[in-house]
Every structure is written in C-alpha cells, then in structure tokens.
C-alpha cells in the first residue's frame, strides 16, 4: 500500500450503497476483529451560487453527505451497542455551525451531521458508546476538487490565501487520536479547530 500499512484492509465502496459499507465492515472485522472506532467521513463539497447551481449537485451532496453518513453509522452501531464499547467520529464542518456564501446545500448537510451527532450521542451514551463530532475550518485536503463552479473556487482560494492557508490534516488527525485515547468513560463531545487567522 502507498501508506505502508501492510495489515490494512482496503475496500472501495459507494457510501450511498448501505450493503457495500456493511460488506466492507464485515471484511475488516473478519481480518482484525470488531470495529472499535469508525471515522464517518462521507462528504463532498459542491460549492456554488445557489441561484445558478444545478439541482443535481444538491442531490449528490444530500445523498453522500447525509445518507452516506447514516449508512456508515448503521454498519457499526449495532455491534458497538452489543459490546457496549466503541467510538464514532462524525466529520462535520464549521459549516455545520454557521452559514457561508456559496455553501447553501453543503451547510445544510453539515447541520444535518451536527444534529444527528447530538441525537446519536444522547442515544448511544446508554450503551457506553461515544459519538464525537468534528467541526474543522479550512484544512489542507482535496475537498476543493469537488468544487465545479470556477468563480466560487477562485473566491475560496483567495480567502484561503488571505488567512495564510489551511491547517494540515495531520493536526486534525492528532486531535482525533488524542480524543480516542481517552478512557471509554470520558468523551470530548466536539472538536472545533480552524486556522488562527480564519475569521469566519
């Protein structure tokens, strides 16, 4: 593997297909035992002026960013409840806490992730399962590859340059690992991190 993880089980799935995710989890558990942590990172960003954005882009974001999230949770939730142990990290965004120009439907999907995370955390706490929502600002990832509207993309990149760039994905990964390593009876309910110079 490119990441030099020889014990990894790699599966290509469409998160909109619940059975594909379930099968991937089954294969992973067959190789390594029960899932103790799931990082729910189903999401694309089709950012654009809502007045000219094709509705097909709305459909794609809603299907992946909401249904994909729930399909991923569904694949591990029952097992974690039965074992009374596990941690689910829900990848939202600061766009799930406030709205931004050209993020209309994207923000809606991330508000969904926030609401579902709060409800899941309440429900699964009775089973000693932790649900942690991640709300990052601008991170250096490939998320902009999903932005098809060239004006929106140019505006986003200009704002990113003004703040000195995004934070590295490794910083966010360190926070995730740190929160995961707390004892099961302790939970960091939400992680919100942005570049220091991000004003919004």
Predicted regions span which residues?
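Active-site-adjacent segment of SDR/Rossmann-fold oxidoreductases
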Residues: 98, 119-129
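Active-site loop immediately N-terminal to the catalytic Tyr-X3-Lys motif
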Residues: 51, 98-104
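Residue(s) in the substrate-gating loop at a strand-loop-helix junction
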Residues: 93
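C-terminal helical subdomain
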Residues: 129, 133-134, 154-199
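The beta1-alpha1 cofactor-binding region of Rossmann-like NAD(H)/NADP(H)-dependent oxidoreductases
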Residues: 12-23, 55
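Active-site helix of classical SDR
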Residues: 73, 109
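Substrate-binding pocket helix/loop in short-chain dehydrogenase/reductase
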Residues: 49-50, 54-62
